């Protein structure tokens, strides 16, 4: 029987498969592939969990951002209302101050007018008295002066009693 190269190749192949089966390479290969598949499945589950957690955090931060924006808008609106109220109050106080100052100025002007009128009247009375005295001194005699003096003293006594 002649053994050619294909026979030895077949024998080598059979021996190779027997050796692989004896060393349990298919089981080790299957176990290795199963472990690799389990690792990939665990990594996918972890990635899914992390993705859900990230989405939850994103939703929470978006909610907090909206709340912060609403709060900021409320603060701005309150500040605008307060500024408007302060502006209105300052305007009202300024108008009241101007009105008081105007009234005080008008009162001072009126008082100055009254004082001036009083001074003019007093000066007119003084001038009239001086003119009367001069006229009376020039035109009355000593007897008429004594009679006028006595009448005036009597009038003063009657008004004092």
Swiss-Prot record:
Keyword DNA-binding: no
Membrane spanning residue stretches: 3-23
Coiled coil: none
Entry keyword annotation includes Cell inner membrane: yes
Membrane topology field: Single-pass membrane protein
Annotated GO MF terms: proton-transporting ATP synthase activity, rotational mechanism; proton-transporting ATPase activity, rotational mechanism
GO CC annotations, alphabetized: plasma membrane; proton-transporting ATP synthase complex
Keywords assigned by UniProt, alphabetized: ATP synthesis, Cell inner membrane, Cell membrane, CF(0), Hydrogen ion transport, Ion transport, Membrane, Transmembrane, Transmembrane helix, Transport
Compartment annotation: Cell inner membrane
Free-text function comment from the UniProt entry: F(1)F(0) ATP synthase produces ATP from ADP in the presence of a proton or sodium gradient. F-type ATPases consist of two structural domains, F(1) containing the extramembraneous catalytic core and F(0) containing the membrane proton channel, linked together by a central stalk and a peripheral stalk. During catalysis, ATP synthesis in the catalytic domain of F(1) is coupled via a rotary mechanism of the central stalk subunits to proton translocation.
Subunit annotation: F-type ATPases have 2 components, F(1) - the catalytic core - and F(0) - the membrane proton channel. F(1) has five subunits: alpha(3), beta(3), gamma(1), delta(1), epsilon(1). F(0) has three main subunits: a(1), b(2) and c(10-14). The alpha and beta chains form an alternating ring which encloses part of the gamma chain. F(1) is attached to F(0) by a central stalk formed by the gamma and epsilon chains, while a peripheral stalk is formed by the delta and b chains.
The family this protein is said to belong to: Belongs to the ATPase B chain family.
NCBIfam families for the chain: PRK09173.1
Designated name of the protein: ATP synthase subunit b 1
Organism field: Agrobacterium fabrum (strain C58 / ATCC 33970)
């Amino acid at each position: 029987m002649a053994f050619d190269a294909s026979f030895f190749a077949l024998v080598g192949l059979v021996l190779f498969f027997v050796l692989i089966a004896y060393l349990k390479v298919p089981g080790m290969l299957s176990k290795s592939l199963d472990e690799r598949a389990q690792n990939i499945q665990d990594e996918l589950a972890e990635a899914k969990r992390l993705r859900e957690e990230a989405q939850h955090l994103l939703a929470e931060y978006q909610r907090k951002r909206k709340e912060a924006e609403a709060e900021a808008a409320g603060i701005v609106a309150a500040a605008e209302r307060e500024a408007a109220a302060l502006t209105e109050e300052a305007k009202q106080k300024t108008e009241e101050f101007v009105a008081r100052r105007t009234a005080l100025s008008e009162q001072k002007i009126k008082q100055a007018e009254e004082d001036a009128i009083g001074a003019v009247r007093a000066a007119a009375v003084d001038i009239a008295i001086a003119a009367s005295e001069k006229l009376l001194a020039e035109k009355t005699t000593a007897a008429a002066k004594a009679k006028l003096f006595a009448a005036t003293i009597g009038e003063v006594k009657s008004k004092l009693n």
